Amino acid sequence: MLLSEVNDGGFRSACTAWLGDRDVVVERLATDAFSGSAIVRVCNGDPGGDLVLKSFPAKARPRIAWVHGLMASLRAAGCREVPAVVSSRSGGTVVEDGCGRAWEAVRFVSGVATDEPSVRQARAASAAVARLHLAAAAWPAAPPRVAVPPAVTRRIEQAGRMLSEPWHSVATPGGEVTSLGDAMAARLVQATAIARETGLSGALQRVMAERAMPTMLQAVVRDLWSSHVLFTTDEPTRVAGIVDFHAAAGDTPATDLARLLGSWCRGPAIPVDDACREALAAYESIRPLSAEEHRLVPWLDATATIFGLDNWFRWVLVKGRRFECSARVLERVDRLVGRLPGAVAWLGGLQGPV
């Protein structure tokens, strides 16, 4: 579709900020299934590559600028997997469209994501993350510091809330019942039965008893899902890009490893346990983990399963939040439900989820 054919004045205004009056070809890649942001590829014929424009609420502008500073610093340090942030014609990297949205433009990264990596892909991904972490630790805007990881504190607090408001007390909101709400309610029943059978309340009590140890914190990606790591199509064991840094914040690097390893499928076709061990070994060949970081990777993975489910149940069934792509939401929830018994068992000391 040509830009002139797009029925969105705000988006056309944003494109003009980067491209002037050129009538370029645009391709809607997606609307982020979880944040609602519009994501559009702009095929502009630039030798540097196509652009990807993404929208945010205008109030997020300071936050976006912080993320852009991090991304620029990482690329300057040699992390070429990080997409290049492109400045507008006025020189800024964030543009407001007059319709309540702020926009960014980054270079399009061509690649393929996988949630069933080969061992070589797992090693390549983790090595790229290790290099990214080393570079992020040198960013002057967010120097490393020692403190209790926010990820740990949040989980301890959420365990307390879940014990006081368990899943069987979750009710659907009044008013219209959505198909997503019906589907989520069915999964809540399933997860509640698993929780009862596996002793989830005991696992939550162990989380509340967690001794939150201070460790090194730095800028990390935090939302490092398998879908955000792209491999080249002609050389599938080489990382082409790591995309979407907009959840980045100061936390323990263990959060990125736990999220990435935890988002890989654990099916019989791929020896994922071996892949996880090899991934950690590849990471440590570049950036050795401290003893506390080692301990936190599986702990954060197991607890993310439990609290991720809790978030989805309450977002949909209590707060009545809507999401554009229900199928993707349910796919993620189904995976979490499938992992719930293993996560509870690991917290009970029976086996590890990674």
Which residue stretches match the model-derived regions?
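Juxta-kinase regulatory segment immediately upstream of eukaryotic protein kinase catalytic domains
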Residues: 1-25
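Protein kinase glycine-rich loop
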Residues: 28-33
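Active-site acidic catalytic loop and adjacent metal/ATP-binding pocket
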Residues: 34-53, 85, 198-255
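ATP-binding pocket architecture of kinase catalytic cores
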Residues: 47-143
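A cross-family kinase active-site recognition segment
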Residues: 116-186, 215-217, 327
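ATP/Mg2+ or Mg2+-diphosphate-binding catalytic cores
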Residues: 146, 150, 161-170, 177, ...
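Active-site activation/catalytic loop segments of kinase-like enzymes and analogous catalytic loops
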Residues: 253-288, 303-321
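All-alpha amphipathic helical-bundle segments outside canonical DNA-binding/catalytic cores
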Residues: 289-301
